[in-house]
Amino acid sequence: MSRKSKGINAEREIIHSFWKISGWTACRVAGSGSMKYPAPDIIAGNATRKLAIECKSTKSKYQYFEKGEIKQLLLYAEMFAAEPWIAIRFNRDKFYFLRPKDLKETKSRYVADLDLAKDQGYLIEHIV
């Protein structure tokens, strides 16, 4: 399975999770990350909240984000009046939802690891 297919499957898993929660809806943004306009991987919401979500699934102990990727998420969220979130799954574990401000910043990128995700992150049932 290609990296692209794995990413799409991870996004779909999150979308199904939102639809299982009463009053919530979610959809995948096709082409996110590959067009010149800022766009998250997933948009989710209910009658009172909107979430812009960047989704990652990794077998590694670390997940890196280019600074531009996070900047685009924040820009989209601001323009759409949505809450920016990052959903990360390490080693086929649960998805942890982090706020961009919780990521560790290096000179050129942002990074999250499983310990950070468990300490600072939320499971989906805690962000809805």
Give, region by region, the residue ranges found by the protein language model.
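Acidic-basic catalytic patches of nuclease active cores, encompassing PD-(D/E)XK
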Residues: M1-G31
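Domain-level recognition of nuclease-like catalytic cores that cleave nucleotide substrates
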Residues: S5, E83-V128
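Amphipathic alpha-helical interface surfaces
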Residues: I14, P38, E69-Q72
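Conserved catalytic cores of phosphodiester-cleaving nucleases, focusing on short active-site segments
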Residues: F18, I42-K59
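Alpha-helix C-cap/termination motif
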Residues: I21, G45, M79-F80
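Active-site metal-binding core of divalent-cation-utilizing nuclease and nuclease-like domains
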Residues: T25-A47
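Short, charged, amphipathic alpha-helix that recurs within catalytic cores of restriction-modification
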Residues: T58-R89
